[in-house]
Amino acid sequence: RFAHDPMAGGHRMWQMAGLKAQRAQTDVNNKQAAFDAAAKEKSDADAALSAAQERRKQKENKEKDAKDKLDKESKRNKPGKATGKGKPVGDKWLDDAGKDSGAPIPDRIADKLRDKEFKNFDDFRRKFWEEVSKDPELSKQFNPGNKKRLSQGLAPRARNKDTVGGRRSFELHHDKPISQDGGVYDMDNLRITTPKRHIDIHRGQ
């Protein structure tokens, strides 16, 4: 019989231990890969959900804007009676049209228009500027070209730096939006703004 070789037995044990460690590491690697794959799948699903929610939010906002615009136009096209007292103004009345919420409706113009019926908001706007043209203290603040526009019921032109694209004239702004039940013909809810300021107001600036 051959003598037992203790070194050979130790070598086999070492090989078996190495194989076990290798298998264990492979198992760990496989589990890590599965975990990473699951994590990526969750991340992708979260991203897809977030994108879907954002698209839904944009769609809802778009639908709300469209509804508000339709509601606003509907109310502006309805007849109504002018209300409100306006505010006293000075000789630089429209200097405030380019800042904050704009310039107020002059009280003496409000006195002329109060309780009068208008076919729609365009009708009110024309009558408003016509009354401004008839007021000596207010009309003298405008150049000849704008005086002519006022007499025709047209809004005066703003300075070039206060215009935006084709919007070149002063505009009437509802301080409390019509879509939030702001009074269409409430002169205390109306401000005169430059086109640029009007756009900034509606952007929340």
Swiss-Prot record:
Q: Does the keyword Hydrolase apply?
A: yes
Its keywords, alphabetically, are: Antibiotic, Antimicrobial, Bacteriocin, Endonuclease, Hydrolase, Metal-binding, Nuclease, Plasmid, Zinc
Which is an annotated GO molecular function term of this record?
A: metal ion binding
Known Pfam families for this protein? Col-Pyo_DNase (PF21431)
Task: Point to the regions of Basic and acidic residues compositional bias.
Answer: 53-76, 88-99, 159-178
- Enzyme class, top EC level, equals hydrolase
Reported EC number(s) for this entry are 3.1.-.-
By its UniProt entry, which SMART domains does this protein fall under?
A: HNHc (SM00507)
Hydrolase found in the keyword field: yes
* Region described as Disordered: 24-109, 136-187
Q: Which domain of life does the UniProt lineage start with? A: Bacteria
Q: Summarize where Zn(2+) binds, as residue positions.
A: 173, 198, 202
Q: Name a biological process GO annotation.
A: killing of cells of another organism
Family affiliation: Belongs to the colicin/pyosin nuclease family.
The record describes the protein's role as: This plasmid-coded bactericidal protein is an endonuclease active on both single- and double-stranded DNA but with undefined specificity.
* Record's protein name: Colicin-E8
| Organism for this UniProt entry | Escherichia coli
